[in-house]
From Swiss-Prot:
Sequence similarity: Belongs to the PNO1 family.
Gene3D superfamilies linked to this entry: K Homology domain, type 1
Keywords noted in UniProt: Nucleus, RNA-binding
InterPro entries linked: KH-I_PNO1_first, KH_dom, KH_dom_type_1_sf, KH_PNO1_2nd
Molecular function terms, GO-annotated: RNA binding
Subcellular location as annotated: Nucleus, Nucleolus
Species the sequence originates in: Drosophila pseudoobscura pseudoobscura (Fruit fly)
Chain ranges of the KH domain: 162-211
Signal peptide location: none
Protein name: RNA-binding protein pno1
GO cellular component: nucleolus
Length: 238
């Protein structure tokens, strides 16, 4: 009786090979921390790193609500706002039309976390009524602020008295407002009973003092004289 040579390897179950590969994968994924000596999964695992990343993104987010009267203006000038925020500040920005909010977020290429606050201030300044070119100064220059107050914070006026006060602040053809802006090196927006001033802290105080004097009834010529004298003294100090 002849005995045939049987290839035993053909009958070896494939489970053992799968187990070896599984063991090898475990060896490559497990790593010992040199500092603590604790063995664990590699830090590059997506499951381990996902929660801290999600938490960090949530904290590095700014939402700016869009007033109804600035909705169309924002859509018209969107590219002028989008370009400097993305290209120069390296931030991520989008207009959430459902919530009517502008959302800014830190991106992987953002050099400084402070850029997020600068970008939010820039968007807020535009929504307050400032021109895009004027609001861009918040991105280019340091120590600039936007201060907002109402006429009733200075003096309680109603009806025609409030309208006349707003007229005194603007002047004929906007002359009074432009004069205050040029002397104090600020930008002013008259939005009904609200007044927004963009500039440095010291210049904002000068402009606010002049505006308060006009609201209280001082003649424009007297306010101009006081402004010029204060501005000349400041220039001499500098």
């Amino acid at each position: 009786m002849e005995v045939e040579n049987i290839n035993v390897d053909a009958f070896v179950p494939a489970k053992k090979a799968q187990k070896r590969s599984a063991v090898n994968n475990q060896d490559t994924e497990m790593q010992v921390d040199q500092a603590t000596g604790i063995e664990g999964l590699v830090a590059g695992s997506t499951q381990a790193s996902a929660p801290p990343r999600a938490k960090r993104i949530k904290s590095e987010l700014r939402k700016v609500s869009v007033p109804p009267h600035r909705y169309s203006s924002l859509k018209e000038h969107w590219m002028k706002i989008f370009t400097p925020v993305v290209e120069h500040m390296k931030l991520q920005i989008r207009f959430n039309m459902k919530a009517r909010q502008v959302e800014l977020r830190v991106g992987p290429e953002t050099p400084d976390i402070a850029n997020l606050q600068k970008g939010a201030d820039f968007v807020k300044a535009f929504l307050c009524g400032f021109e895009v070119d004027d609001a861009l100064a918040l991105l280019r220059l340091e120590d600039l602020f936007v201060e907002t107050f109402e006429i009733k914070d200075v003096k309680t006026l109603r009806g025609d008295h409030q309208s006349r006060a707003i007229g005194r602040l603007a002047g004929k053809g906007g002359r009074t407002k432009f004069t205050i802006e040029n002397v104090t090196k600020t930008r002013i927006v008259l939005a009904d009973s609200k007044i927004h001033i963009l500039g440095s802290y010291q210049n904002i105080q000068l402009a606010r003092r002049a505006i308060c004097n006009l609201i209280l009834g001082s003649p424009p010529s007297k306010v101009y004289g006081n402004l010029r004298s204060v501005a000349s003294r400041l220039s001499e100090r500098m």
